[in-house]
Amino acid sequence: CGALKNVVALGAGFCDGLGLGGNTKAAIVRIGLGEMERFCCDFFSGVQSRTFFQSCGIADLITTCYGGRNRKCAAAFAAGGQAWAEIERDLLNGQKLQGTITCQDVMTCLVARGRVGHYPLFARIHEIAFQGKPPQSIVTLPAALSSRL
């Protein structure tokens, strides 16, 4: 479940690349934590919600969303026209970008189980990263979900 933080970090990075404020980014991180918990509880037995409020949960998520390589690369993606492979090559010095791989795997899982609608942030991040949806579309998500959370 720890890999899901990298997907959320893509969303946080889109916020940074667009120059959005801290409140928007914090809203994305908050929604992301909720979707991480829901995903793990939906698909893995024995998951305890309190785990997400420990160092391995929220603390790791915050660190990744505010300083990790997935955030950094997503910021570059949102800021201007490079493909993921170019960004990875130019910014990571041989390291791999895990968030994009995990994002694709998560979406494959959700589609196969008919659960995409239950994970609007994961779906939006996938749309931006792989389906050509503009990064600016991340901005409308927190307001659209406020009545559901």
Protein language model regions, located:
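NAD(P)-dependent Rossmann-like dehydrogenase/reductase catalytic/cofactor-binding core
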Residues: K5, A9-A27, L33-E37, C41-L149
